[in-house]
Structure formats: structure tokens, C-alpha cells
A protein has these predicted regions:
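Glycine-rich FAD pyrophosphate-binding loop
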Residues: 27-47
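Dinucleotide-binding Rossmann-like beta1-alpha1 core, especially the glycine-rich loop
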Residues: 52-130, 260-265, 269-273, 420-422
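C-terminal catalytic lobe of FAD-dependent flavoproteins
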Residues: 260, 269, 283-286, 291-411, ...
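Helical element adjacent to the flavin cofactor pocket in flavoenzyme catalytic cores
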Residues: 144-200, 211
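Beta1/beta-strand and adjacent pyrophosphate-binding region of the FAD-binding site
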Residues: 4-18, 35
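Conserved Rossmann-like nucleotide-cofactor binding loop
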Residues: 18, 42, 208
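Short beta-strand to alpha-helix junction loop
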Residues: 65-68, 95-103, 144-162, 172, ...
Length: 435
């Protein structure tokens, strides 16, 4: 058994895709004396049950950069670290029901072009050429992203972990962190197996980030602005027509996003994966009667398909093939949300030599880029890209728990909402006011 490390340059708390990516990128930057702590097995939080979609599209410059980098990293990661990877680059089609949505797509295409990506606008008659099972009579067009796809979240995390270990970094599984303290300019990270003295500490604890954040309050920290949503997706039985089409064409269907109806539909082997972002959504662990469990590793919420009924019916009308298959499995798991739906990655406000890489709503898509950004913050003191929209310091003390819950539910229900200039979303109003 390996000796327990008592010192390190960096300790990362949390072993999901983001935490593993942070460790990998630090090690690649030459900082191999780093330790990742995971209370259970790697991926035990939100990573293991994630759908694994990997888009590049975003209307945020920071997020688009992270997601673009992730797709580039993932293409070569398996070979780079000698680990098997199921990464399918299928392309994706985002549907537009209005001219306003097409204008948003044109803007995203321009952003992508400036980052070296070749997003394409599709006319209505071009959509069926790429997705023959779709109804298009009420559409205005679509945005096609050739680099979109999906990846196995567990394989991704294990590949990043292997790459980090091969470079000399350490991963301690089944080693819960229990607190932190200061010793001069260093941090002492306490675990059930002993203490680790380090220069820097990273909160990458996913939906436990708020609980971990409490440990830093004596040293200038604040309550991490976040809440937790229930997100469901359903997997169908195999569909013979889909199997035949894939065999004939030699690849999977593009991932379909009906953003005005608020769901994604993806080919999963020879069936389909439907994941809505419903308006009548549900938050968890937001009040004393529904507390955050001490350990929710590898657990799910009970199925709750009734609140998805409208979205399932809408998807069946859009892709009638969906209605021919039975439901094989339902996944209903916790996903963390910040009040604006953006992750927290950067310096921990008010706390020296402490960083956050947490509250990733799309941690699989953004995980690769997040590791790069976090490693740059620690090793260089700055990032290549403008990351202010994801910086933890963008929030101040107006983000109480009621505000976080209201905004998180609003963001979830409008996951694909169009963000017009000067539009004021109603949830949480009057919480932040001028003097």
C-alpha cells in the first residue's frame, strides 16, 4: 500500500471529471506534487450518471472556449494516456422555431468562427438530409456543429486520472476530506486518514461544494452560491429502423436539440436518449425537511416522469420514431447550479491560495477546459482566456440561499433560453440594489 502523503503543492477536494481534469492539467504543467481526495470512488457524484454530451456551442465566450478545448482534448486523450475511450463525434443539429432563434445561431456561428470552429447554418430542407426521421414543417432552420458528440463520463474521468498518475500526481480514493486549517502561509487539509500540508487547495466537490466551502469561512470565505436540481433523462429500447440506418450509413445520428421546446435527443446505441429541461422543475436539498445527505455516492432520485409528459409528447411529434419504442431506463440525478447557470472556476473570494472548480452544470463538456483554466490560475496567476463570466468573485453577499434556489430553478427551466440584451429575468429581483 502506498504511503500516505503528508505534503503537496496542491490538494484537490473532489474526484469527478472536473477534479480529475484539474489534477491532469497541473501535472502536465509540471506540478506533479499534487493530491486529489475523493470520499468514495472517482465519479461518485454527478459524473457517473451524466448523459455525457460534449457540445462546443455556447453564447458565452468563456464557456465556448472551455467546451471547444474539451472537444480537442478528448479526441486525442485515449491515445495520449493509453486508456480506452468511447467518444463519438456525431455532430449536432439545433432547431430554430423562429427568426429570433436563427439570429442567435448566426451570432454563435460568428463566435465560433473567431475561435476556429466551423459551425454551419442549415436551411429547413437541409435538416432532413442529416436527420431523416425528423418533422420539419414548423421550423425556420438549424445550426449544425460538426464537433458535437458524446463521451462516456466514467471513461473520461479514469483516463484523466491515469494521465495524472502517470505524470506523478496522486489520487486518494475512499479518503474523505473533513476540514481545513491554516499553518502560516500553508493549508492543512484534514482527512480521515491524516493531514496533508499544501500551498494551494481546490474545492472541486460538485454538489457538495457548499459544504466544503463552509470550512473556509474562518479564513475569509463565504457561502458558495449554488443549489441542486433534479435532472432526468430516459433511455429507450432498441429501435430496428435506427439500427438499420446506422448500419447503412456507418455512424450514429447527429445529436438533436430542440431548444425552443427545451430538450435534447441523442442516439444511444440503437435506441434514443431524451433529456428535457422542464419548466416545472424540481430542486433538492434546499430546506431543513430535505437536507443534503452525508453521502449520496452513486445514488439517484426516484423516477418522476409525470413532469416530463409534455416534453416527451413534443419529442414524439418531432421525431415520431421515438414513439415506437418503450422506456428502458430513467436516470434522475443531482446537478449543481449557480444562480446564472455558469460554473465557479477561479480564486476563492477572500481566501488566499484557495480556488474553486465547482458547480459545473455541464461538467463533462466543460471539464477539459476547466482543468486547463484552473491549472493556469494556480501555476501562472492568470488565464489565457477571459474567464470573468465564470469567476467565483462575480458574486457578492446578495446571493443568499433563497436567491440561489429561485435563480437556479429559473435557469434550469430556461436552459436553452435566448438571452436578449437588457432582458431582465424575473426571479430574485430586488435582491441586488443600487445604494
Amino acid at each position: 500500500m502506498a504511503e500516505f502523503p503528508t505534503t503537496a503543492r496542491v490538494v484537490i477536494i473532489g474526484g469527478g471529471a472536473v477534479g480529475a481534469s484539474c489534477l491532469y492539467h497541473l501535472a502536465k504543467a509540471g506540478w506533479a506534487d499534487c493530491v486529489l481526495l475523493e470520499r468514495n470512488e472517482l465519479t461518485a457524484g454527478s459524473t457517473w450518471h451524466a448523459a455525457g454530451n460534449v457540445p462546443t456551442f455556447s453564447t458565452s465566450w468563456s464557456v465556448m472556449n472551455m467546451q471547444r478545448y474539451s472537444t480537442e482534448l478528448y479526441r486525442g486523450l485515449g491515445a495520449a494516456v493509453d486508456y480506452p475511450m468511447n467518444y463519438h463525434v456525431t455532430g449536432s443539429i439545433r432547431l430554430a422555431h423562429s427568426k429570433e432563434r436563427m439570429q442567435e445561431f448566426q451570432r454563435a456561428k460568428g463566435m465560433g468562427k473567431s475561435q476556429g470552429m466551423d459551425l454551419d447554418i442549415l436551411a429547413v430542407d437541409e435538416i432532413k438530409n442529416r436527420y431523416p426521421f425528423i418533422e420539419t414543417h414548423d421550423l425556420h432552420g438549424a445550426l449544425y456543429d460538426p464537433n458535437d458528440g458524446d463521451i462516456d463520463p466514467a471513461q473520461l474521468t479514469q483516463a484523466l486520472a491515469k494521465g495524472a498518475r502517470d505524470l506523478g500526481a496522486k489520487i486518494l480514493r475512499f479518503t474523505p476530506a473533513t476540514g481545513v486549517s491554516r499553518a502560516g502561509d500553508d493549508w492543512i487539509v484534514q482527512t480521515e486518514k491524516g493531514d496533508i500540508r499544501c500551498e494551494f487547495v481546490v474545492n472541486a466537490a460538485g454538489y457538495y461544494a457548499q459544504r466544503v466551502g463552509e470550512w473556509f469561512k474562518p479564513y475569509g470565505g463565504r457561502t458558495v452560491p449554488m443549489m441542486v436540481m433534479s435532472h432526468q433523462y430516459m433511455l429507450t429500447d432498441e429501435i430496428p429502423e435506427l439500427e438499420a440506418w446506422s448500419a447503412e450509413n456507418g455512424h450514429k445520428l447527429p445529436l438533436l436539440r430542440d431548444v425552443d421546446s427545451s430538450y435534447y435527443l441523442r442516439q444511444e446505441k440503437h435506441g434514443l436518449n431524451l433529456g428535457p429541461y422542464e419548466r416545472n422543475c424540481k430542486a433538492h436539498w434546499v430546506n431543513p425537511s430535505d437536507p443534503l445527505p452525508e453521502d449520496f455516492s452513486f445514488q439517484l432520485y426516484p423516477d418522476d416522469l409525470e413532469r416530463l409528459e409534455w416534453y416527451v409528447e413534443d419529442a414524439m411529434a418531432r421525431v415520431p420514431l421515438l414513439g415506437t419504442a418503450g422506456v428502458n431506463k430513467v436516470i434522475n440525478g443531482p446537478i449543481p447550479y449557480a444562480p446564472d447557470g455558469m460554473p465557479l472556476i477561479g480564486p476563492m473570494p477572500g481566501v488566499p491560495n484557495a480556488f474553486e472548480a465547482c458547480v459545473f452544470t455541464f461538467g463533462i463538456a466543460q471539464g477539459g477546459g476547466a482543468g486547463k483554466v484552473l491549472a493556469e490560475w494556480i501555476t501562472e496567476g492568470q488565464t489565457e482566456w477571459d474567464m470573468w463570466s465564470c469567476d467565483p468573485r462575480r458574486y457578492t453577499d446578495y446571493t443568499n440561499q433563497a436567491y440561489c434556489v429561485a435563480k437556479g430553478m429559473e435557469v434550469y427551466g430556461h436552459e436553452y433560453g435566448m438571452h436578449f440584451p437588457w432582458h431582465e429575468w424575473p426571479a430574485g429581483r430586488d435582491q441586488k440594489l443600487s445604494p
